[in-house]
Amino acid sequence: MKKKILLLIIISLPALGSEIIDKRKQLFQENKDHMRFIYKAMQSGDMDPIINSSMAIEKFASEMPEYFPEGSESRGASDNIWSDFEGFIKSAKANQLAAQKLKLAAQVNEIEKLNGLFNELSNTCKSCHRSYKN
């Protein structure tokens, strides 16, 4: 009986890894969409999409490391994620904080700060991609 349970667990592991990989790909695509929404909203001066999209990016960034458990390696994810997981966590935290700063500026209508904060947020994405994306 124990052998059957162990075999079932071993067989299920790749499927679990595949599910989390698919989910993180979906969330990264949503992040990309949110960046576009923010950019367009900055052109029109509409703060609501900036606030909402910044909140979504902030939320995902706070959870991002959870979507990279050991054994969930994929073609697009660099091995550096797992060999330097603390660095990866710091990069996700930088992204979270940049999204939070953009959200806060939009909430108080600090339009003059938005371009700089959007660039800061964008740079956290680029920095992480350089280090942790294939």
Where are these regions (language model features)?
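Processing junctions and N-termini across compartments
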Residues: 11, 119-122
